[in-house]
Amino acid sequence: MEAIGVLMMCPMSTYLEQELDKRFKLFRYWTQPAQRDFLALQAESIRAVVGNSNAGADAELIDALPKLEIVSSFSVGLDKVDLIKCEEKGVRVTNTPDVLTDDVADLAIGLILAVLRRICECDKYVRRGAWKFGDFKLTTKFSGKRVGIIGLGRIGLAVAERAEAFDCPISYFSRSKKPNTNYTYYGSVVELASNSDILVVACPLTPETTHIINREVIDALGPKGVLINIGRGPHVDEPELVSALVEGRLGGAGLDVFEREPEVPEKLFGLENVVLLPHVGSGTVETRKVMADLVVGNLEAHFSGKPLLTPVV
């Protein structure tokens, strides 16, 4: 398979890059100063694209690669892949489901605790020597809080199971009511937010879920409510979120994702009721290795004429 051209869209895992380089003719797209010229020159050689949640395969790229057979994404979400164009062109698509569920769900619980118990602020308080002059202010407990989840898929369900260990009542909004759960279902996000202390965004990014967290939802969650986003940045109307936090209309937020990563609204930096993470939901050594193996495994299966491990298209 050494002659098969694989286009890696951006830096991802060093391990993934090494494994691809061992098996294929690897092209590193981000290193090319003149990318259009590069594509024109190598178009006949590239049969696979490896992307992630930041850089995938849009219609323009797919059209520029006439020999493209497969897009293997180093992510669960495929919002950076034009699935309709792939179907039209007969291009296969794979992702890395299931393997990152635990890490992302764990992080959601960590964000909830960090916001409610002000863990980051407590750490700063000790480090700057303030404890010597008085105790830190009281915080808010997590146990027993009403947790609402937008999207009860693999990750949403894993968050729910973890929150249950804290005796939290669970409710959810999804495209349809789930038949095999006793969690309370709400038919609108506003209704869910109105009945939640903590609202967790865990759904895929689609045109319908873009800005699913808007002013109406934020106001329904209210000045004691907490928003946790482990989905995608564009799920949240970021200017509305910033305004609500600054004005005290929302109690707090834990954010692993942002609308224009790596850009983050500077107004969030000085707010002690906000915890900000650099999109590290699946960022553990163990999980990233398994994800990389799945990307490589899908490519090897495709080019060996075997069934794909995690087919999407």
From Swiss-Prot:
NADP(+) binds at residues 152-155, 174-176, 230, 256. Catalyzes the NAD(P)H-dependent reduction of 4-hydroxyphenylpyruvate to 4-hydroxyphenyllactate and 3,4-dihydroxyphenylpyruvate to 3,4-dihydroxyphenyllactate in the biosynthesis of rosmarinic acid. Rosmarinic acid is an ester of caffeic acid and 3,4-dihydroxyphenyllactic acid. NADP is the preferred substrate. GO terms for cellular component: cytosol. InterPro entries: D-isomer_2-hydroxyacid_DH (IPR050223), D-isomer_2_OHA_DH_cat_dom (IPR006139), D-isomer_DH_CS1 (IPR029752), D-isomer_DH_NAD-bd (IPR006140), NAD(P)-bd_dom_sf (IPR036291). GO terms for molecular function: glyoxylate reductase (NADPH) activity; hydroxyphenylpyruvate reductase activity; hydroxypyruvate reductase [NAD(P)H] activity; NAD binding. It comes from Plectranthus scutellarioides. It catalyses: (2R)-2-hydroxy-3-(4-hydroxyphenyl)propanoate + NAD(+) = 3-(4-hydroxyphenyl)pyruvate + NADH + H(+); (2R)-2-hydroxy-3-(4-hydroxyphenyl)propanoate + NADP(+) = 3-(4-hydroxyphenyl)pyruvate + NADPH + H(+); (2R)-3-(3,4-dihydroxyphenyl)lactate + NADP(+) = 3-(3,4-dihydroxyphenyl)pyruvate + NADPH + H(+); (2R)-3-(3,4-dihydroxyphenyl)lactate + NAD(+) = 3-(3,4-dihydroxyphenyl)pyruvate + NADH + H(+). Belongs to the D-isomer specific 2-hydroxyacid dehydrogenase family. Its EC number is 1.1.1.237. Pfam families: 2-Hacid_dh, 2-Hacid_dh_C. This is Hydroxyphenylpyruvate reductase. Keywords: NAD, NADP, Nucleotide-binding, Oxidoreductase, Pyruvate. The active site is at 232, 261, 279 (proton donor). It comes from the Eukaryota.
